[in-house]
Amino acid sequence: KSTELLIRKLPFQRLVREIAQDFKTDLRFQSHAVLALQEAAEAYLVGLFEDTNLCAIHAKRVTIMPKDIQLARRIRGERA
């Protein structure tokens, strides 16, 4: 478990700007703000995939499936 970022910075930054554009145009981001968003997003995704993998293992599978992600999110209380 390293602390290095898993997603390249520029593609993530473009994604953040693209999503933000839907809410307000001409937004500017400090580099530290984008980095904080990326660290939070990656931490969330890593945790979700860890839980998803546990769901697949519980079902006696080694391959994760969409239903594993759905179950993990439901157990976490993220989706009713």
From Swiss-Prot:
Query: InterPro entries in the record, alphabetically?
Result: Histone-fold, Histone_H2A/H2B/H3, Histone_H3/CENP-A
Q: Which CDD domains match?
A: HFD_H3
State the family it belongs to.
Belongs to the histone H3 family.
Q: Where in the cell is it found?
A: Nucleus; Chromosome
Matching Pfam families: Histone
What is said about its interaction partners and assembly?
The nucleosome is a histone octamer containing two molecules each of H2A, H2B, H3 and H4 assembled in one H3-H4 heterotetramer and two H2A-H2B heterodimers. The octamer wraps approximately 147 bp of DNA.
Tell me which GO cellular component terms the UniProt record holds.
nucleosome; nucleus
Highest taxon of the lineage: Eukaryota
Q: Which organism is it from?
A: Hordeum vulgare (Barley)
List keywords of the entry alphabetically: Chromosome, DNA-binding, Nucleosome core, Nucleus
Does the keyword Nucleus belong to this entry? yes
Describe the function of this protein: Variant histone H3 which replaces conventional H3 in a wide range of nucleosomes in active genes. Constitutes the predominant form of histone H3 in non-dividing cells and is incorporated into chromatin independently of DNA synthesis. Deposited at sites of nucleosomal displacement throughout transcribed genes, suggesting that it represents an epigenetic imprint of transcriptionally active chromatin. Nucleosomes wrap and compact DNA into chromatin, limiting DNA accessibility to the cellular machineries which require DNA as a template.
The GO terms this record gives for MF are: DNA binding; protein heterodimerization activity; structural constituent of chromatin
Main location, first listed in the record:
nucleus
The top of its lineage is:
Eukaryota, Viridiplantae, Streptophyta, Embryophyta, Tracheophyta
- PANTHER family, alphabetized: HISTONE H3 (PTHR11426)
**What is the name of this protein?**
Histone H3.3
